[in-house]
Amino acid sequence: MSEIPGDLKFLKSHEWARVEGNGRVTVGISDHAQGLLGDLVYVELPEVGATAKANEQIAVVESVKAASDVYSPVSGTIVEVNSALSDKPETINEDAYGDGWMYVVELSNAEELNELLDPDAYAEALEDEDH
């Protein structure tokens, strides 16, 4: 398993959130999730201006093996999407925590960040999942 960046927070369903400090949060799926899915062939992103709700489905990733819903770690308004993923969904496989980000949300409730797992808790959840 790859290194889990220390600046991220996670949902147990393998989505990550990076607080950008300007009231915005960048979201993607974890390296563990992309590894389980295998080669991604399609990504359905939310539209800019759409409303994300914490723990609700906001996007879809499809691999040669399966389709998987992506849940938003936080609530707010979508202000940017990584449209490059439309042509190169495999970017998530190659760089899940970097160029493979999915969207940016303008946070509506910063308290929701406290509900997310820190990297250590996420790593523990992965270990529990493997047993």
UniProtKB/Swiss-Prot annotation:
Signal peptide: none annotated. Keywords: Lipoyl. The keyword Transmembrane does not apply. Binds 1 lipoyl cofactor covalently. It comes from the Bacteria. Its cofactor is (R)-lipoate. One of its GO terms (biological process) is glycine decarboxylation via glycine cleavage system. Gene3D superfamilies: 2.40.50.100. The keyword Membrane does not apply. Residues 24-106 form the Lipoyl-binding domain. GO terms for cellular component: cytosol; glycine cleavage complex. InterPro entries: Biotin_lipoyl, GCV_H, GCV_H/Fam206, GCV_H_sub, Single_hybrid_motif. It holds the Pfam family GCV_H. The modification N6-lipoyllysine is found at K65. SUPFAM superfamilies: Single hybrid motif. PROSITE patterns: BIOTINYL_LIPOYL. Belongs to the GcvH family. NCBIfam families: gcvH, PRK01202.1. The glycine cleavage system catalyzes the degradation of glycine. The H protein shuttles the methylamine group of glycine from the P protein to the T protein. The glycine cleavage system is composed of four proteins: P, T, L and H. This is Glycine cleavage system H protein. It comes from Stenotrophomonas maltophilia (strain R551-3).
